[in-house]
Amino acid sequence: MANYFNTLNLRQQLAQLGKCRFMGRDEFADGASYLQGKKVVIVGCGAQGLNQGLNMRDSGLDISYALRKEAIAEKRASWRKATENGFKVGTYEELIPQADLVVNLTPDKQHSDVVRSVQPLMKDGAALGYSHGFNIVEVGEQIRKDITVVMVAPKCPGTEVREEYKRGFGVPTLIAVHPENDPKGEGMAIAKAWAAATGGHRAGVLESSFVAEVKSDLMGEQTILCGMLQAGSLLCFDKLVAEGTDPAYAEKLIQFGWETITEALKQGGITLMMDRLSNPAKLRAYALSEQLKEIMAPLFQKHMDDIISGEFSSGMMADWANDDKKLLTWREETGKTAFETAPQFEGKIGEQEYFDKGVLMIAMVKAGVELAFETMVDSGIIEESAYYESLHELPLIANTIARKRLYEMNVVISDTAEYGNYLFSYACVPLLKPFMAELQPGDLGSAIPEGAVDNAQLRDVNDAIRSHAIEQVGKKLRGYMTDMKRIAVAG
């Protein structure tokens, strides 16, 4: 099979990369009704599979789970989760032939095997759904022409999809229809109903394309969302310890620092995160972030280039064929790093202390978010898509590190994200070592003293922070979410 994106001509590539439209709430007036009375069969019962299924059932849809015979016979975790939550469970042969919509929510590396197994069983005119388009775009999976292919991609982990639904809201979601597979022209109606059934329409839905979702998703997770956090954790910990900081304190400052810092990012973007610093610290964080952007820009661009060309995907799929040798080696090496094996600090670190003593970490977040966003936009991805795949998801990933360090992050994210994370972090750590050697007192582990600042310089820095394109689009999208949550709660 050929990489689907690479079969398109340049005009088609640019059109699909640039497809992104924020959909109005009125476009979801019919809710999930288009799928009511139809049979929806989910393949896979992991975090997305289970939690999307719970939401869809609560929205009035007929949901069941198709699992492999071995998973049922051996009563594996997927079988237990589905049955314990009261769902009908059966084999592919038992459930797929009756399905109007088959939703493939298995890991990326299983998609080809799953699709080859279920496609011959699907009835004429059925629909096939994904929550990530890797199999269609990068693998180039060929789907029968009578089958409609759609995507609903919540921009949050599965647990968050469920919790927000239970609160009467939802999570921002991308939806798309594969242009090669919409024989009856009903793809958008199916995708909208599925998104509404998960609650996504209450938080904001972007009409996108399989191509735009895949290319932006890969870029975000490899760079700022996972790769930058991993590289930053390892570099900052080693720097602190080398300068005499207690390893336990250093570990806690970093492990929980990312979450604390990005919570401000979540509420008010880079502007609010930077506003949590004193004026001297803000000026220093800005200067550091500009240095970091200059150093890391070629690395970010290389990742984007390799994603666009398909070089990244072909390399990762070669590792799949080699029993994940690279992935497993990198995972083992990460587990042995000094940061991962450091003792726990039993003392308390106050919220403001994370900001005051984490100026470098804030600079890394700012630089990484802006670089990821800028690089995606320069490659033809629309700003709204770039925002969701950079700034929006960062607090969610930072939260996984707060739970069990890098181990937890790499367990929670997909194998695709984990592989890309290692590619980036293994290149980024040595790239930034000379920069780390030139840091000043107050950049990390101690606070920058209060002092006079130049008013004109502070004004210009504040203007530069607030006028960045990601701050403009972020303010708009966060406003949509706030307004929609207010409407949802009131309703």
Swiss-Prot record:
- Residues bound to NADP(+) are C45, G46, A47, Q48, R68, R76, S78, D108, K109, Q110, G158
GO terms under cellular component = cytosol
EC number(s) stated in the UniProt entry for this protein: 1.1.1.86
Binding-site residues for Mg(2+) 1, renumbered to this chain? D217, E221
Q: Catalytic positions?
A: H132
Q: What Pfam families does its record include? A: KARI_C, KARI_N
Keywords (alphabetical) are: Amino-acid biosynthesis, Branched-chain amino acid biosynthesis, Magnesium, Metal-binding, NADP, Oxidoreductase, Repeat
Q: How is the cofactor bound?
A: Binds 2 magnesium ions per subunit.
State the InterPro entries in the record. Answer: 6-PGluconate_DH-like_C_sf (IPR008927), 6PGD_dom2 (IPR013328), KARI (IPR013023), KARI_C (IPR000506), KARI_N (IPR013116), NAD(P)-bd_dom_sf (IPR036291)
Which residues bind Mg(2+) 2 per the record?
A: D217, E389, E393
Q: Which reaction does it catalyse?
A: (2R)-2,3-dihydroxy-3-methylbutanoate + NADP(+) = (2S)-2-acetolactate + NADPH + H(+); (2R,3R)-2,3-dihydroxy-3-methylpentanoate + NADP(+) = (S)-2-ethyl-2-hydroxy-3-oxobutanoate + NADPH + H(+)
Q: Which molecular function terms from Gene Ontology are attached?
A: ketol-acid reductoisomerase activity; magnesium ion binding
Q: Pathway listed for it?
A: Amino-acid biosynthesis; L-isoleucine biosynthesis; L-isoleucine from 2-oxobutanoate: step 2/4; Amino-acid biosynthesis; L-valine biosynthesis; L-valine from pyruvate: step 2/4
Name the Gene Ontology biological process terms: isoleucine biosynthetic process; L-valine biosynthetic process
Domain named KARI C-terminal knotted is located at 209-344, 345-484
Residues holding substrate: S414
Give the stretches traversing the membrane.
none
Q: Show where the KARI N-terminal Rossmann domain sits.
A: 15-208
PANTHER family the record matches: KETOL-ACID REDUCTOISOMERASE, MITOCHONDRIAL
* Family membership noted in the UniProt record: Belongs to the ketol-acid reductoisomerase family.
- Under what name is this protein listed? Ketol-acid reductoisomerase (NADP(+))
- Annotated organism of origin: Salmonella typhi
Taxon lineage: Bacteria, Pseudomonadati, Pseudomonadota, Gammaproteobacteria, Enterobacterales
